[in-house]
Amino acid sequence: MAAATASASASASAAAFLLLPLLAAAATAGHGVCPRQPAAAAVLPRQSSCPAAGSPGHRAHHVGVVEGDDFVLQKAVTLVLQNREDFVAILFYASWCPFSKIFRTDFQKLSSFFPTIAHFSFEESRIKPRMLSRYGVRAFPTLFLVNSTMRVRYHGSRTMNSLAMFYKDVTGMNPVSLDAISLERMEEVVNIIENDKKTEQGDSLFMFARSPDRLLHQDTCLALASSFVLMRLLCFLLPKLNACVKQAWRMQFYELKRLLSNLS
Protein backbone atom coordinates (compact mmCIF):
# COMPACT_ATOMS: atom_id res chain seq x y z
CA MET A 1 0.00 0.00 0.00
CA ALA A 2 2.84 2.40 0.88
CA ALA A 3 4.56 1.55 -2.42
CA ALA A 4 1.42 2.41 -4.38
CA THR A 5 1.10 5.75 -2.57
CA ALA A 6 4.73 6.61 -3.24
CA SER A 7 4.31 5.71 -6.92
CA ALA A 8 1.23 7.96 -7.26
CA SER A 9 3.03 10.86 -5.56
CA ALA A 10 6.00 10.48 -7.89
CA SER A 11 3.71 10.48 -10.94
CA ALA A 12 1.95 13.68 -9.77
CA SER A 13 5.29 15.41 -9.19
CA ALA A 14 6.48 14.46 -12.68
CA ALA A 15 3.26 15.75 -14.27
CA ALA A 16 3.51 19.04 -12.39
CA PHE A 17 7.13 19.41 -13.51
CA LEU A 18 6.12 18.90 -17.14
CA LEU A 19 3.28 21.45 -16.88
CA LEU A 20 5.45 24.21 -15.42
CA PRO A 21 6.63 25.58 -18.84
CA LEU A 22 3.04 25.64 -20.13
CA LEU A 23 1.79 27.48 -17.04
CA ALA A 24 4.60 30.02 -17.33
CA ALA A 25 3.80 30.63 -21.00
CA ALA A 26 0.12 31.11 -20.17
CA ALA A 27 1.00 33.60 -17.43
CA THR A 28 3.08 35.75 -19.79
CA ALA A 29 0.70 35.52 -22.76
CA GLY A 30 -1.55 38.25 -21.39
CA HIS A 31 1.36 40.71 -21.43
CA GLY A 32 3.26 39.71 -24.56
CA VAL A 33 0.42 39.26 -27.06
CA CYS A 34 -1.63 42.11 -28.53
CA PRO A 35 -5.40 41.54 -28.48
CA ARG A 36 -7.24 41.08 -31.73
CA GLN A 37 -8.53 44.37 -33.11
CA PRO A 38 -12.31 44.79 -33.41
CA ALA A 39 -14.09 45.27 -36.72
CA ALA A 40 -14.26 49.04 -36.20
CA ALA A 41 -10.45 49.19 -36.46
CA ALA A 42 -10.80 48.61 -40.22
CA VAL A 43 -12.57 51.97 -40.46
CA LEU A 44 -10.72 53.89 -37.77
CA PRO A 45 -6.94 54.09 -38.29
CA ARG A 46 -5.42 53.89 -34.82
CA GLN A 47 -2.06 53.81 -33.22
CA SER A 48 -0.99 50.63 -31.48
CA SER A 49 -3.28 49.91 -28.53
CA CYS A 50 -1.18 47.07 -27.06
CA PRO A 51 0.31 48.45 -23.82
CA ALA A 52 3.70 47.46 -22.54
CA ALA A 53 3.98 45.03 -19.64
CA GLY A 54 3.06 46.70 -16.37
CA SER A 55 1.71 49.88 -17.98
CA PRO A 56 -1.86 50.99 -17.21
CA GLY A 57 -4.55 50.82 -19.87
CA HIS A 58 -5.09 53.93 -21.95
CA ARG A 59 -7.51 55.16 -24.58
CA ALA A 60 -6.64 54.58 -28.19
CA HIS A 61 -5.58 57.59 -30.26
CA HIS A 62 -7.41 58.19 -33.52
CA VAL A 63 -5.37 59.71 -36.33
CA GLY A 64 -7.06 62.35 -38.48
CA VAL A 65 -10.65 62.61 -39.72
CA VAL A 66 -12.48 59.71 -41.37
CA GLU A 67 -14.44 60.86 -44.43
CA GLY A 68 -17.29 58.55 -45.37
CA ASP A 69 -20.86 57.78 -46.39
CA ASP A 70 -23.86 55.99 -44.86
CA PHE A 71 -21.81 52.84 -44.25
CA VAL A 72 -19.13 54.72 -42.32
CA LEU A 73 -21.82 56.55 -40.34
CA GLN A 74 -23.20 53.19 -39.28
CA LYS A 75 -19.68 52.16 -38.24
CA ALA A 76 -19.45 55.30 -36.11
CA VAL A 77 -22.71 54.37 -34.38
CA THR A 78 -21.34 50.87 -33.79
CA LEU A 79 -18.20 52.36 -32.26
CA VAL A 80 -20.32 54.41 -29.86
CA LEU A 81 -22.25 51.31 -28.79
CA GLN A 82 -19.06 49.29 -28.26
CA ASN A 83 -17.31 52.00 -26.22
CA ARG A 84 -20.03 53.46 -24.03
CA GLU A 85 -17.81 55.98 -22.25
CA ASP A 86 -16.06 57.28 -25.38
CA PHE A 87 -17.21 60.22 -27.47
CA VAL A 88 -17.37 60.47 -31.25
CA ALA A 89 -17.33 63.77 -33.18
CA ILE A 90 -19.54 63.85 -36.29
CA LEU A 91 -19.50 66.72 -38.80
CA PHE A 92 -22.05 67.15 -41.59
CA TYR A 93 -20.99 69.65 -44.25
CA ALA A 94 -21.75 70.68 -47.84
CA SER A 95 -19.15 71.24 -50.54
CA TRP A 96 -21.04 74.27 -51.89
CA CYS A 97 -21.11 76.02 -48.50
CA PRO A 98 -18.16 78.38 -47.89
CA PHE A 99 -18.60 78.09 -44.11
CA SER A 100 -18.23 74.31 -44.39
CA LYS A 101 -14.86 74.68 -46.10
CA ILE A 102 -13.52 76.76 -43.22
CA PHE A 103 -15.05 74.47 -40.62
CA ARG A 104 -13.43 71.38 -42.18
CA THR A 105 -9.99 72.87 -41.53
CA ASP A 106 -10.86 73.57 -37.90
CA PHE A 107 -12.36 70.09 -37.55
CA GLN A 108 -9.09 68.56 -38.72
CA LYS A 109 -7.22 70.60 -36.12
CA LEU A 110 -9.63 69.43 -33.42
CA SER A 111 -8.86 65.81 -34.29
CA SER A 112 -5.22 66.54 -33.42
CA PHE A 113 -6.04 68.45 -30.23
CA PHE A 114 -8.39 65.67 -29.05
CA PRO A 115 -6.85 62.44 -30.42
CA THR A 116 -8.84 60.17 -28.08
CA ILE A 117 -12.07 61.24 -29.81
CA ALA A 118 -12.84 59.61 -33.16
CA HIS A 119 -13.70 62.25 -35.78
CA PHE A 120 -16.00 61.55 -38.73
CA SER A 121 -17.07 63.95 -41.50
CA PHE A 122 -19.84 63.41 -44.05
CA GLU A 123 -20.49 65.42 -47.21
CA GLU A 124 -24.12 66.21 -48.00
CA SER A 125 -24.22 64.45 -51.37
CA ARG A 126 -22.84 61.18 -49.89
CA ILE A 127 -25.49 60.89 -47.17
CA LYS A 128 -29.10 59.94 -47.76
CA PRO A 129 -31.64 62.65 -46.91
CA ARG A 130 -33.36 60.40 -44.37
CA MET A 131 -30.08 60.13 -42.44
CA LEU A 132 -29.80 63.92 -42.34
CA SER A 133 -33.39 64.14 -41.13
CA ARG A 134 -32.72 61.53 -38.46
CA TYR A 135 -29.92 63.66 -37.04
CA GLY A 136 -31.88 66.89 -37.41
CA VAL A 137 -29.44 68.44 -39.88
CA ARG A 138 -31.11 71.50 -41.42
CA ALA A 139 -28.06 73.67 -42.09
CA PHE A 140 -24.37 73.25 -42.81
CA PRO A 141 -21.96 72.81 -41.18
CA THR A 142 -23.41 70.86 -38.24
CA LEU A 143 -21.23 69.33 -35.50
CA PHE A 144 -22.25 66.70 -32.95
CA LEU A 145 -20.49 65.08 -30.01
CA VAL A 146 -22.06 61.67 -29.45
CA ASN A 147 -21.71 58.86 -26.96
CA SER A 148 -24.03 56.06 -25.87
CA THR A 149 -26.12 58.29 -23.61
CA MET A 150 -26.17 61.73 -25.24
CA ARG A 151 -25.92 63.64 -28.50
CA VAL A 152 -24.88 67.28 -28.13
CA ARG A 153 -25.08 69.73 -31.03
CA TYR A 154 -22.72 72.69 -31.30
CA HIS A 155 -24.40 76.10 -31.55
CA GLY A 156 -21.52 78.48 -30.77
CA SER A 157 -19.19 80.56 -32.89
CA ARG A 158 -16.77 78.95 -35.34
CA THR A 159 -13.56 79.92 -33.54
CA MET A 160 -11.05 77.37 -32.31
CA ASN A 161 -11.28 78.59 -28.72
CA SER A 162 -15.05 78.24 -28.69
CA LEU A 163 -14.87 74.77 -30.26
CA ALA A 164 -12.21 73.63 -27.78
CA MET A 165 -14.32 74.86 -24.86
CA PHE A 166 -17.31 72.98 -26.29
CA TYR A 167 -15.26 69.77 -26.42
CA LYS A 168 -14.01 70.30 -22.86
CA ASP A 169 -17.46 71.09 -21.42
CA VAL A 170 -19.11 68.06 -23.01
CA THR A 171 -16.37 65.43 -22.68
CA GLY A 172 -14.39 66.76 -19.72
CA MET A 173 -11.16 66.36 -21.70
CA ASN A 174 -8.44 68.95 -22.12
CA PRO A 175 -6.71 69.46 -25.47
CA VAL A 176 -3.37 67.68 -25.65
CA SER A 177 -0.07 69.39 -26.37
CA LEU A 178 0.99 68.60 -29.91
CA ASP A 179 4.45 67.37 -30.77
CA ALA A 180 6.33 68.34 -33.92
CA ILE A 181 5.09 65.31 -35.86
CA SER A 182 1.44 66.06 -35.08
CA LEU A 183 1.86 69.69 -36.05
CA GLU A 184 3.53 68.69 -39.32
CA ARG A 185 0.74 66.22 -40.12
CA MET A 186 -1.91 68.81 -39.34
CA GLU A 187 -0.15 71.39 -41.53
CA GLU A 188 -0.08 68.91 -44.42
CA VAL A 189 -3.81 68.29 -44.11
CA VAL A 190 -4.54 72.02 -43.99
CA ASN A 191 -2.45 72.55 -47.14
CA ILE A 192 -4.37 69.79 -48.91
CA ILE A 193 -7.69 71.39 -47.99
CA GLU A 194 -6.46 74.80 -49.17
CA ASN A 195 -5.37 73.30 -52.51
CA ASP A 196 -8.80 71.72 -52.87
CA LYS A 197 -10.39 75.12 -52.30
CA LYS A 198 -8.26 76.70 -55.05
CA THR A 199 -9.11 73.88 -57.45
CA GLU A 200 -12.83 74.24 -56.75
CA GLN A 201 -12.65 78.00 -57.29
CA GLY A 202 -10.83 77.51 -60.60
CA ASP A 203 -13.39 75.00 -61.80
CA SER A 204 -16.43 76.97 -60.64
CA LEU A 205 -16.51 79.04 -63.85
CA PHE A 206 -17.03 75.90 -65.93
CA MET A 207 -19.35 74.10 -63.52
CA PHE A 208 -22.59 75.02 -65.28
CA ALA A 209 -21.33 74.04 -68.75
CA ARG A 210 -19.91 70.77 -67.44
CA SER A 211 -22.79 69.51 -65.29
CA PRO A 212 -25.91 71.71 -64.98
CA ASP A 213 -27.77 68.96 -63.12
CA ARG A 214 -25.07 68.90 -60.44
CA LEU A 215 -25.23 72.70 -60.20
CA LEU A 216 -28.99 72.54 -59.69
CA HIS A 217 -28.61 69.85 -57.03
CA GLN A 218 -25.73 71.28 -55.02
CA ASP A 219 -26.03 75.05 -55.73
CA THR A 220 -29.79 75.47 -55.80
CA CYS A 221 -29.68 79.08 -54.61
CA LEU A 222 -27.12 80.01 -57.26
CA ALA A 223 -29.17 78.29 -59.99
CA LEU A 224 -32.36 80.09 -58.94
CA ALA A 225 -30.57 83.44 -58.76
CA SER A 226 -29.07 82.91 -62.22
CA SER A 227 -32.47 81.98 -63.63
CA PHE A 228 -34.02 85.11 -62.10
CA VAL A 229 -31.34 87.34 -63.64
CA LEU A 230 -31.82 85.72 -67.06
CA MET A 231 -35.59 86.14 -66.89
CA ARG A 232 -35.24 89.82 -65.95
CA LEU A 233 -32.79 90.31 -68.80
CA LEU A 234 -35.20 88.73 -71.25
CA CYS A 235 -38.07 90.89 -69.96
CA PHE A 236 -35.90 93.95 -70.56
CA LEU A 237 -34.63 92.95 -74.01
CA LEU A 238 -37.71 91.35 -75.57
CA PRO A 239 -39.78 94.57 -75.92
CA LYS A 240 -36.85 96.37 -77.53
CA LEU A 241 -36.18 93.41 -79.82
CA ASN A 242 -39.86 93.27 -80.76
CA ALA A 243 -39.87 96.99 -81.60
CA CYS A 244 -36.77 96.60 -83.78
CA VAL A 245 -38.33 93.68 -85.68
CA LYS A 246 -41.54 95.61 -86.28
CA GLN A 247 -39.57 98.63 -87.51
CA ALA A 248 -37.58 96.43 -89.91
CA TRP A 249 -40.75 94.81 -91.31
CA ARG A 250 -42.39 98.22 -91.68
CA MET A 251 -39.43 99.53 -93.66
CA GLN A 252 -39.42 96.44 -95.86
CA PHE A 253 -43.15 96.82 -96.44
CA TYR A 254 -42.79 100.49 -97.48
CA GLU A 255 -39.89 99.62 -99.78
CA LEU A 256 -41.89 96.83 -101.43
CA LYS A 257 -44.89 99.13 -101.83
CA ARG A 258 -42.71 101.79 -103.49
CA LEU A 259 -41.28 99.26 -105.95
CA LEU A 260 -44.74 98.03 -106.90
CA SER A 261 -45.95 101.58 -107.48
CA ASN A 262 -42.98 102.29 -109.76
CA LEU A 263 -43.63 99.16 -111.81
CA SER A 264 -47.24 100.07 -112.32
UniProtKB/Swiss-Prot annotation:
Which SUPFAM superfamilies does the entry link to? Thioredoxin-like
Q: What is its main location?
A: membrane
What CDD domains does the annotation carry? Answer: PDI_a_ERp44_like
Chain segments annotated as transmembrane: 221-241
Glycosylation is annotated at: 147
Compartments, record wording? Membrane
Say yes or no: keyword Lyase present. Answer: no
UniProt keyword list = Glycoprotein, Membrane, Signal, Transmembrane, Transmembrane helix
Q: Which PANTHER family match?
A: 5'-ADENYLYLSULFATE REDUCTASE-LIKE 4, 5'-ADENYLYLSULFATE REDUCTASE-LIKE 4-RELATED
According to UniProt, the name of this protein is 5'-adenylylsulfate reductase-like 4
Tell me which species this is from.
Oryza sativa subsp. japonica
Q: Which gene encodes it?
A: APRL4
